[in-house]
Design a protein with these regions (language model features):
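A generic secondary-structure micro-motif detector
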Residues: 1, 39, 66-67, 89-90, ...
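AMP-binding/adenylate-forming domain of the ANL superfamily
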Residues: 1-25, 44-45, 63
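Structural core segment of the AMP-binding/adenylate-forming
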Residues: 10-11, 55-56, 83-160
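AMP-dependent adenylate-forming
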Residues: 11-37, 143-146
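Short, flexible hinge/linker loops that cap or flank conserved catalytic cores
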Residues: 16, 58, 105, 175-176
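Conserved pre-ATP/AMP-binding loop-to-beta segment of ANL
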Residues: 19-22, 153-156, 160-176
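Conserved AMP-binding/adenylate-forming core of the ANL superfamily
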Residues: 24-79, 96-101, 154-160
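Generic anion/oxyanion-binding catalytic loop in active/binding sites
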Residues: 31-38, 70, 89-92, 147, ...
Length: 176
């Protein structure tokens, strides 16, 4: 028996099957120690991302930028965005300011996820040149967000918008 799932549903189906079994082993930004996440943990964070994006008003087929090296948060954003049928636009972690500006404007990106300090700094410098860009969401909690930057938040604060999965019914409908 073959069951076809939308990509966004796969992580949740695997979480039902494997629960607390290890899914990912990773190092935090700049970290030296290895950590792991279970299928259940990743599934829950992906749901929070989907809910948070809906709370920000992200629509079906809207573009969301990810300007980061590979990370757990990158994966969670990909699956979370796909869960509401949004499109993730990947940026090279080494993209120049001109490249970022072009991609943000061309794709009409409102929300740009960034990884580390260098990526945040570049995104902040081009922010005013990108009329559609509303918010920079920073994965690495060690990044220094300027006190003069009301348009940037940490990923952990972004996730609070999806805490308790307030819009999960809508997310589930979008995944059918």
């Amino acid at each position: 028996m073959q069951t076809n799932y939308h990509m966004s549903v796969l992580v949740h189906e695997q979480a039902k099957k494997y629960g607390d079994r290890e899914m990912l082993i990773y190092q935090d930004f700049g970290g030296k120690e290895w950590k792991s996440l279970s299928w259940y943990q990743v599934s829950q964070t992906v749901k929070q991302v989907s809910n948070a994006l809906l709370n920000l008003g992200v629509k079906v087929q809207e573009n969301i930028g990810i300007f980061s090296q590979n990370s757990v948060q990158y994966i969670e954003c990909d699956f979370g965005a796909w869960g509401i049928r949004a499109v993730t636009i990947p940026f090279y972690a080494t993209s120049s300011e001109q490249q970022i500006q072009f991609m943000v404007n061309d794709a009409k990106i409102r929300y740009l996820f960034v990884g580390e300090q260098d990526q945040y700094d570049k995104a902040r410098r081009i922010f005013s040149l990108c009329p559609t860009l509303e918010r920079i969401i920073v994965f690495d909690p060690m990044v220094h967000i300027s006190t003069h930057d009301p348009n940037a938040v940490y990923f952990s604060d972004f996730l609070k918008l999806g805490e308790n999965l307030p819009r999960q019914t809508e997310v589930d409908k979008l995944q059918q």
